[in-house]
Amino acid sequence: MIFMILTKFEKARIIGARALQIAMGAPVIIDISPDIIDPIDIAMIEFENNVIPITIKRNQ
């Protein structure tokens, strides 16, 4: 697996898009404690664990 270095803008876009998906009812991919209910916090945890199913395609 290739790990890309993301810019802060790409990171914000990925976390924001995933948080929106979670807020709209998408299933959470990882197990989290029941007291974490904020979609942004959940998306950040998923991002840190590298499990967000979103890919980045850059134009070169």
From Swiss-Prot:
DNA-dependent RNA polymerase (RNAP) catalyzes the transcription of DNA into RNA using the four ribonucleoside triphosphates as substrates. It comes from the Archaea. HAMAP family: RNApol_arch_Rpo6 (MF_00192). GO terms for molecular function: DNA binding; DNA-directed RNA polymerase activity. One of its GO terms (biological process) is tRNA transcription by RNA polymerase III. This is DNA-directed RNA polymerase subunit Rpo6. It catalyses: RNA(n) + a ribonucleoside 5'-triphosphate = RNA(n+1) + diphosphate. Part of the RNA polymerase complex. Its EC number is 2.7.7.6. Belongs to the archaeal Rpo6/eukaryotic RPB6 RNA polymerase subunit family.
